[in-house]
Design a protein with these regions (language model features):
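Extended, charge-rich alpha-helical scaffolding segments
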Residues: 1-86, 90-91
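Short terminal interaction segments
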Residues: 80-121
Length: 121
């Protein structure tokens, strides 16, 4: 179980890093959209698509690890959310804290990307 949690933490950190890259591209796009620089917009969009593909790949890894954790804990994977896993880790405070930090960072990064993308629309 410990290795599954370590794996989940690592995957969440990887996903956070990918979202941070996506956020940077989204922020870079704003002035490019305003200046109507279509070549630069195309370049940034191509790089964004690469990062989105990476995020999809990482998300599949996270889903698999979550499924493995659900199997070990004899729980329904569809009801096992990250917040639930964090709560269940109360007896392992170090892992719980690492998971919570990764979850919060991921949640914040996703929210920032959504906000910038709304502005760019």
């Amino acid at each position: 179980m410990a290795s599954l949690m370590e794996n989940l933490i690592s995957i969440l950190q990887e996903e956070c890093d990918a979202y941070d890259k996506l956020l940077k591209f989204s922020m870079d796009k704003t002035p490019v959209i305003v200046s109507e620089d279509l070549k630069e917009l195309e370049r940034i969009t191509d790089e964004e698509q690469t990062v989105v593909s990476d995020i999809n790949r990482i998300d599949k890894k996270r889903e698999q690890v979550t499924k493995d954790i659900a199997d070990v804990m004899n729980m329904d994977v569809h009801k096992l959310k990250l917040k639930t896993i964090i709560q269940l880790m109360a007896k392992r405070p170090e892992e719980q804290e690492a998971l919570e930090k990764s979850y919060d960072r991921l949640h914040q990064s996703v929210h920032q990307v959504e906000n910038i993308n709304r502005e760019n629309a």
